[in-house]
Amino acid sequence: MKIYHGRKRGLIIMDHWLSLIFIIGFIIVHFGSKYVKLSVASPRSFWFSLFGGATIAYMFLFLLPELNQYFEAVKSNVGDSWPSILDNYTYLLALIGLIIYFGMDLYARSRKDVDEEDPDSTSEPVLLVHMSTFVFYNVTIGYLLIRGEFISGMDLTVYFIALSAHFIVTDFTLKELHSGVHDKYGRWILSAAVLIGWLIGALYELPTWIVSIAISLLAGGITFNVFKEELKESTFKNYFAFVGGAFVIAALVMVFT
């Protein structure tokens, strides 16, 4: 994320402890998805739209602007040899991320239609293929939780709130597609992935160009997954919930980041 020089050591240590608390929170969100009942069919739950609005606001107001900073950092490291054709490469990668997640979602849904009467309507191999994209998702989010140079504990807290909201939506989407298989395996895989990302960040600082690619693909995936859900049989109630979630996170981002 942003690089802030001259931060006090005590603040950095506090943020690391806070990130540990939040990584545990992410894991609880994934495990708790088995026990929370929300409507994914029509009428869709008010909460899905609220969480979707919160996530998309965070992406547009925080993640996408960060791509510019990473792009400038990568470009300055390369120097004059940087090809002008790649001046928008971070946004191109975000588009590629959207396309990848769209394709994987279509694949999973096409496999589900093969046998609608099976309670575990998609097989374990299909779940694992689909889940691989969300493993990348979670590893990136876990890494940024500790390596993102947030300016304060509140800044980090806004990140946790927005991404927790998104995890709730994606967990229920995966449950809709993969039924009992997700409860049996998926939530374990997602919990492990976000923890692994955090551990990588605790032990290593990845090169800027790798982080920029990861955030770009993540932004594309978030865009697809949020709007895919909002375009399903939504009502004005869902719309106003979406606007409310977006407004709250937008206000928090503007105040604390």
Question: Where in the sequence are the language-model features?
Answer:
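Intrinsically disordered, metal-sensing/regulatory segments
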Residues: 1-257
